[in-house]
Amino acid sequence: MIPGVSMEMLNLVDAGEIDIAAIIRPPFSFQSDLRWTTLAQEPFRLIVPRGVKGKDWAALLSEHPFIRYDRASFGGRQVDRFLRRMHFTVREMCELDELEAIVRLVENGVGVAIVPQTATYRRWPAKVRAVDLGHHTFHRDVGLVHRAPQHLSEPVKLLLQLIEAQALKKS
């Protein structure tokens, strides 16, 4: 296993340097010899400091400094597209690529953010409150990118099957 950002991992699979990568689904189609298996869908939420009152996500977003999820990441691009589609102008405080750091800043009252509700954050920290985006909710797909099965070794095929089976159990 090696850590890395989604684009780097995708490039390594495409180059044949690694067999499988767990990544955020990119906003573009894969080449014909690459396959995608969705493992989870994570809804985006507006997170605010616990003491901030109100349930209207649009009002909260316009009234408070915005901590932006990095636009260089696939998830951050989704947030950026959402804001543009909604014709929303935010008071940007900073831009970060680390979700945990974003949550910590919100927890400390620095501002608000739109982030995916990941498995790590099934429950938000005590000082953070999540506000649903209602019918505007969007998701990011987390999954596996790999080469077509005929290009994989038997142990890798077996691993892929086990991961897919486990993901099906949880969904």
Could you describe each region identified by the protein language model?
Residues 1-29, 95-96:
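Central regulatory/effector-binding core of bacterial HTH transcription factors
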Residues 12, 16-17, 38, 65, ...:
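Conserved functional loop/turn residues at catalytic and ligand-binding sites
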Residues 22-32, 99-129:
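A ligand-binding cleft/hinge motif common to bilobed small-molecule-binding domains
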Residues 17, 76-89:
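Ligand-binding cleft/hinge of the Venus flytrap
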Residues 8-9, 56, 100-102:
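Short acidic active-site motifs
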